[in-house]
């Protein structure tokens, strides 16, 4: 992984100079943008460019396991929380908190069902 277009004089016009600093911070982003060097998996993980590294040949299996894990969660709240996290970037704290509340409020029925299941003893120790 890397910003290989640097080697050929091709500018980053695909949003790379905007998105990369938001993902890994300005220092790491400038390092990658300016040098065009290759980044190995362990370094990408350390700098926050990726969230997980799996052994060679196991990427599909790991991706499917993650997809199944996410699919098992209540979907309305999962989607609302994801949307809130994405929308909050760059917002003032108070505005982001209000937006989070607005999105979460729409999912309260699902949350009450989940709380009832937990109170009944389900879901303890991370198991459902």
Language model segments and positions:
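C-terminal alpha-helix plus adjacent terminal tail
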Residues: 36-41, 61, 65-68, 72-128
């Amino acid at each position: 992984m890397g910003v290989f277009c640097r080697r050929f004089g091709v500018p980053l016009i695909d949003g790379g100079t905007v998105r990369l600093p938001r993902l890994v911070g300005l220092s790491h982003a400038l390092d990658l943008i300016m040098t065009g060097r290759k980044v190995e998996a362990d370094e990408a993980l350390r700098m926050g460019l990726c969230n997980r590294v799996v052994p060679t040949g196991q990427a599909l299996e790991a991706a499917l396991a993650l997809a199944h894990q996410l699919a098992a969660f209540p979907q309305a709240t999962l989607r609302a929380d994801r949307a809130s996290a994405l929308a909050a970037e760059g917002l003032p704290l108070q505005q982001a908190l209000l937006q989070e509340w607005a999105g979460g409020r729409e999912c309260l029925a699902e949350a009450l069902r989940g709380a009832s299941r937990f109170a009944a003893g389900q879901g303890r120790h991370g198991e459902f």
